[in-house]
């Protein structure tokens, strides 16, 4: 009887610990996405050549898009996560269109690429805050971005 009570206490304590530890992890996961775009902006600003800046931004968008697609198609995420990822992908696609000047957007001028990279960081941070993505999906995205890059 005492052994059973102890196992229940351990299980209950473990569940509580998982919830307590998951909260900061969730916030950190979104921070990792923000860091990804911030690192891209820093690379853009440290490069003088406009075509290189475009390449850095384009590759960053492509890597994130591939990671989002893989997570979305993995079957490991909920319907709510899929909806959130679709919203995030739509925002990302808008940035790609702005950079390239497609789908009704004017192409970002060479002289504005540094400012555009900052704008992307701010806009993607806001998108990450507005979109609901679970911890599991967020961690999968981060892992895949690291593996793709």
Protein language model features and the residues they cover:
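Extended interaction regions within the primary functional domain
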Residues: 1-2, 20
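Membrane-proximal, non-transmembrane alpha-helical segments
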Residues: 79-134
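Hydrophobic h-region of N-terminal signal peptides that target proteins for export
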Residues: 16-24
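N-terminal leader/propeptide segments of preproteins
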Residues: 8, 23-77
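Extracytoplasmic/secreted proteins, especially bacterial periplasmic and envelope-associated proteins
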Residues: 32, 39, 59, 63, ...
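Intrinsic disorder/low-complexity segments
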Residues: 12, 23, 128-129
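Core hydrophobic alpha-helical membrane-spanning segments
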Residues: 13-16, 135-148
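Bacterial N-terminal signal peptides that target proteins for export
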Residues: 2-12
């Amino acid at each position: 009887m005492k052994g059973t009570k102890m196992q229940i206490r351990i299980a209950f304590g473990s569940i509580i610990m998982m919830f307590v530890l998951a909260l900061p992890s969730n916030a950190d996961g979104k921070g990792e996405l923000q860091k990804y775009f911030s690192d891209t902006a820093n690379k853009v600003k440290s490069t003088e050549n406009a075509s290189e800046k475009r390449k850095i931004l384009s590759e960053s968008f492509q890597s994130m898009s591939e990671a989002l697609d893989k997570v979305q198609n993995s079957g490991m995420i909920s319907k709510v996560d899929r909806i959130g990822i679709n919203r995030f992908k739509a925002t990302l696609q808008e940035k790609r269109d702005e950079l390239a000047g497609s789908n009704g957007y004017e192409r970002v001028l060479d002289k504005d690429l540094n400012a555009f990279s900052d704008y992307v960081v701010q806009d993607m941070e806001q998108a990450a805050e507005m979109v609901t993505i679970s911890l599991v999906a967020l961690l999968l995205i981060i892992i895949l971005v690291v593996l793709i890059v």
